[in-house]
């Protein structure tokens, strides 16, 4: 072939190798027109459905690694990557078996390699900058710039679809009260299989309420936590006015009161902030903290007290190191140190416990310094819904020899002071929490929370559970029995929804069969982990500009962050050191070590 012929063929070959330009497609011809074609969720692999005219659509497959009318044809590298990637269930099996192998891995550089892989793979599943919100099912400047909104991972179900969940399922969703009573209400207490205790439950609730603060006035699509991450607004308040009321303005410290020789949060008489207590509770009995609802549970006020003491303790250490610093610098630097301590404890103890992994998780921001990573986070509505873990709550609360019902426990303003921090930490560390997944484990006192979440998801028109599984790289379930792993609940779900592709997001998470020896199912892990890790490592203190000793007041402050632990947090702020762990003491690994399941080891 001549050189001229080659020069003519080469451009043609290039054109053949390029993915075809998406064409505008007609909707399913079997359905009477006009039906919004995006109601069928035709675009796969994160392709974006764009409607044209009444019944035409086009899938935007840009940078998905796929092409074709519905983004289903993988590019060569995508195909190769998918072929080599292990399934989530196999990965989970590897990480939770072979204890002695992981002991070796954790002692070598392989731990950091795997940790970097975990962080990047998980975090890349979360779009940054944010994409959608409750008012905009398309990319908009408002979705990016207005931090009053929760972001959304998937756009809402189009309003003009044949059924509430798109095109599948019944014309009307099941009665939410009936759904909750049949499938979520506890028959008998099912304990968490990992030995999880209610100290873990209270830590989770206290920690997450700094960024889950849905606006009652503006609606469920809006948040009052404008920091969208770990900013400790639940300690310092979510606005400057509240913060100023809580500060002592001396040596960087927060206001406090001394009761029976111990430090506790101030009363609302001493710090004039709004706290939500029942009518009739006198102001001197209302403790003032950053989050206005923490008076609800003694467990929440317990952690508020511990973090208050930690803040003032760190202020003393910094004051000794930097006698020339003024109140403002002491306060601001201490806040950064406590943010670092929080992230350290959450990753290395809280998430470690949840995962059940033998891989020892590590908080080390430098692992991501060479990766493409955005140090900014936006809380998603789906993350907020996912994190309603009220099955953790027991039937009653045991403190010493005394058993408290919900009626006695809620808004109990004297329990914390009467027992003291040490006694409550010890008691909560010894009481089993409930299993989250698998269904039928909501105590009737908290069942209304599940009802409210489902109602909110319907108002916000969240897409079906299976669409979220696909969004996070999981295979959609093909039947209710595959979802639940048993026949009875599957039959009830079939009766209620009619189609597995019409199952709602939150019920799907709560009714999915649990992973072996796990507190919940595959979807909760595979969806929750990316949100969590992106939010934690996306914090500004983890960026190259912030992550250095000078940010934290020098080596003393930096060392506080790098050596933080749950036990230190409690025991450095109490006169005696109680039993403190996220696992009950009569469970294997109660000393904080990783649980060894010898019967199932490789």
Swiss-Prot record:
Catalytic activity: (5Z,8Z,11Z,14Z)-eicosatetraenoate + AH2 + 2 O2 = prostaglandin H2 + A + H2O; (5Z,8Z,11Z,14Z)-eicosatetraenoate + 2 O2 = prostaglandin G2; prostaglandin G2 + AH2 = prostaglandin H2 + A + H2O; (9Z,12Z)-octadecadienoate + AH2 + O2 = (9R)-hydroxy-(10E,12Z)-octadecadienoate + A + H2O
Record-level Gene Ontology MF annotations: dioxygenase activity; heme binding; metal ion binding; peroxidase activity; prostaglandin-endoperoxide synthase activity
Residue ranges of domain EGF-like in the record: 34-72
Keyword Cell inner membrane included in the entry's annotation: no
Misc. comment: The conversion of arachidonate to prostaglandin H2 is a 2 step reaction: a cyclooxygenase (COX) reaction which converts arachidonate to prostaglandin G2 (PGG2) and a peroxidase reaction in which PGG2 is reduced to prostaglandin H2 (PGH2). The cyclooxygenase reaction occurs in a hydrophobic channel in the core of the enzyme. The peroxidase reaction occurs at a heme-containing active site located near the protein surface. The nonsteroidal anti-inflammatory drugs (NSAIDs) binding site corresponds to the cyclooxygenase active site.
Function of the molecule: Dual cyclooxygenase and peroxidase that plays an important role in the biosynthesis pathway of prostanoids, a class of C20 oxylipins mainly derived from arachidonate ((5Z,8Z,11Z,14Z)-eicosatetraenoate, AA, C20:4(n-6)), with a particular role in the inflammatory response. The cyclooxygenase activity oxygenates AA to the hydroperoxy endoperoxide prostaglandin G2 (PGG2), and the peroxidase activity reduces PGG2 to the hydroxy endoperoxide prostaglandin H2 (PGH2), the precursor of all 2-series prostaglandins and thromboxanes.
Name of the protein this chain belongs to: Prostaglandin G/H synthase 1
Species of origin: Mus musculus
Gene designation: Ptgs1
